[in-house]
């Protein structure tokens, strides 16, 4: 009977931790600049997203820096140096910012720095208790990078 109670307790703890880790939905009180920038990014309007974010001028926000880094990295042509500065700023504000860790890892791959990308993956692994989307996405990007570069 004690084993059954122990198993139920462990299951309950594991289940509740998984629910916490999976809850990455943006809050309803997200600032308008964030929603506007995300809308522009979704539409691949990276220059418009950059303008929206710069007008909002929220340099103490990890999300603001992360979105600016993302838009700088994805625009044509990408500004990798600017993207890196924004990702570094986001991680200085919030060292566990999962989006910044994932995207900074992808930036490292763009710069052919596999070791840097793997460092970001290791950091994500430590903060994502039972995996998370950002960890899985970066892990997949690293695997694709390795496969692509084996052929060269």
What residue ranges belong to the model's regions?
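Terminal, low-structured helical/coil segments at or just beyond the last alpha-helical repeat
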Residues: 23-31, 118-152
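Alpha-helical segment of the N-proximal tetratricopeptide repeat
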Residues: 28-56
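Residue-level recognition of tetratricopeptide repeat
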Residues: 38, 70-72, 106
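Register position in tetratricopeptide repeats
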Residues: 42-43, 74-76, 110, 127, ...
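Structural signature of tandem alpha-helical TPR/SEL1-like repeats
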Residues: 43-48, 76-89, 112-120
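Structural marker of alpha-solenoid helical repeat scaffolds
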Residues: 56-59, 93, 126-130
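TPR alpha-solenoid repeat register
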Residues: 64-66, 100, 134
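Canonical tetratricopeptide repeat
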Residues: 67-68, 103, 137-141
């Amino acid at each position: 009977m004690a084993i059954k109670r122990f198993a139920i307790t462990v299951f309950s703890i594991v289940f509740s931790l998984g629910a916490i880790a999976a809850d990455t939905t943006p809050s309803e009180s997200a600032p308008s600049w964030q929603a506007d920038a995300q809308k522009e990014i979704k539409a691949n309007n990276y220059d418009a997203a950059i303008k929206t974010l710069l007008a909002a001028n929220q340099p103490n926000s990890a999300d603001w820096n992360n979105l600016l880094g993302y838009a700088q990295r994805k625009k044509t042509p990408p500004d990798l140096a600017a993207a890196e500065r924004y990702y570094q700023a986001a991680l200085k504000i919030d060292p566990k910012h999962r989006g910044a860790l994932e995207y900074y890892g992808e930036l490292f791959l763009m710069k052919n720095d596999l070791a840097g990308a793997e460092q970001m993956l290791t950091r994500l692994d430590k903060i994502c208790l039972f995996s998370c989307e950002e960890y899985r996405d970066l892990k997949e990007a690293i695997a694709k990078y390795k496969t692509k570069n084996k052929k060269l």
